Amino acid sequence: MLKFNEYFTGKVKSIGFDSDSIGPASVGVMEKGEYTFSTAKAEEMTVITGSLKVLIPGSPDWQTFMPGETFYIPGESEFNLQVAEASSYLCKYLS
């Protein structure tokens, strides 16, 4: 079953799904802007289009991820994103 999510007054939208091959995940799009997200479970995020500049918890430096690149966010944490142009991503929720 698909689950539709909307954050930051519609600037971030995603569709959650459960896949036999990758488990629980979502695919989404972020408009240009700056965002702070909280996580319950650890997440593996892969950029599909655009780019995401991320301040990963525990890291002092911002890192930019391009299409095909993946980064990991620990569970029960908060992370910051800067998005320079509309960008899409795949997020896998890890156990």
Swiss-Prot record:
SUPFAM superfamilies: RmlC-like cupins
EC id: 2.4.2.1, 2.4.2.2
Organism: Yersinia pestis
UniProt entry keywords in alphabetical sequence: Glycosyltransferase, Transferase
Gene Ontology CC: cytosol
Gene Ontology terms, MF aspect: guanosine phosphorylase activity; purine-nucleoside phosphorylase activity; pyrimidine-nucleoside phosphorylase activity; thymidine phosphorylase activity; uridine phosphorylase activity
Function: Catalyzes the phosphorolysis of diverse nucleosides, yielding D-ribose 1-phosphate and the respective free bases. Can use uridine, adenosine, guanosine, cytidine, thymidine, inosine and xanthosine as substrates. Also catalyzes the reverse reactions.
InterPro entries: Ppnp, RmlC-like_jellyroll, RmlC_Cupin_sf
The protein's enzyme class: transferase
Reactions mediated catalytically: a purine D-ribonucleoside + phosphate = a purine nucleobase + alpha-D-ribose 1-phosphate; adenosine + phosphate = alpha-D-ribose 1-phosphate + adenine; cytidine + phosphate = cytosine + alpha-D-ribose 1-phosphate; guanosine + phosphate = alpha-D-ribose 1-phosphate + guanine
UniProt keyword annotation of Transferase present: yes
Protein's UniProt name: Pyrimidine/purine nucleoside phosphorylase
Superkingdom of the source species: Bacteria
UniProt family annotation: Belongs to the nucleoside phosphorylase PpnP family.
Gene3D superfamilies: Jelly Rolls
The keyword DNA-binding belongs to this UniProt entry's keyword annotation: no
UniProt-listed Pfam families: Ppnp
